[in-house]
Regions:
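Functional cores of ribonucleases/endoribonucleases
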Residues: 2, 7-11, 15-18, 23-24, ...
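Glycine-rich loop/hinge motif
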Residues: 41
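An extracellular/secretory-lumen and virion-surface interaction module
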Residues: 44
């Protein structure tokens, strides 16, 4: 339940009346996710508990790959905000979200946590548009392999905090399926062939203008 007394508090996006209807009584415990989603989310959490690690190993994920996910450059929720998917959903469902258009079968929910609740932020904002950078910062951008692709990166002293969050769900006849979540503004998927040519070009154009921040040292 949120501060308004309803299971989740969503605001309607322009073209998503149907999604608002389907989300009206959404409870965090009703959102389905698999162990592979938990593995993917290691790149958006600061760590994990022993039970999750045990579950990942039992599911066939090897220690080397688990550690690699935990060290990938990217935006991460602080450990005092959430360390797993259930905890994250319980947190963000307390705050209003706007439903955004994604161009695919998913729905994207973007919201803001009150700074009064988490004065130091809920996580890091490790992806910025190049227009948010100074001229000297833009000159220091470099390419690095990240998530299997050559993507733009910039070394900084400290990645800034954020109070913003993005949650991506897929509506199905059986309910909503968790796709991903991360601190910060909505983003397009990384360009992949499975997306189709037009969507892949849209995603490439997005990531050609966005930079991953990595801390020095």
């Amino acid at each position: 339940m949120n501060a308004k007394g309803s299971p989740c508090w969503w605001q309607m996006g322009e073209n998503y009346f149907f999604a608002t209807q389907s989300l009206a009584n959404l409870e965090p415990t009703n959102i389905k996710y698999r162990i592979d989603n938990a593995f993917h989310m290691l790149r958006h959490f600061e760590g994990m508990d022993e039970q999750l690690q045990t579950n990942l190993l039992r599911a066939g994920h090897v220690e080397k790959n688990i550690q690699a996910e935990l060290t990938l450059p990217g935006s991460r929720f602080f450990s005092n905000f959430a360390l797993d998917i259930p905890g994250l959903l319980n947190r963000i469902c307390l705050y209003p979200s706007v439903i955004l258009e994604t161009g695919d079968r998913n729905i994207q929910l973007n919201g803001q946590v009150s700074p009064a609740d988490f004065p130091n932020g809920i996580g890091t904002k490790a992806v910025l548009h190049v227009d948010e950078l100074s001229a000297s910062q833009r000159a220091a951008i470099f390419l690095r392999k990240n998530r299997g692709l050559d993507l733009l990166h910039l070394q900084v002293d400290k990645v800034p905090p954020t109070w913003e969050f993005t949650l991506v769900l897929r509506p199905t006849q059986q309910g909503h399926v968790f796709i991903t979540a991360f601190p910060g503004s909505p983003a397009l998927p990384l360009p992949q062939h499975r997306l189709g040519r037009k969507r892949q070009e849209e995603c490439k154009a997005f990531w050609d203008k966005h930079v991953f921040l990595v801390e020095a040292g």
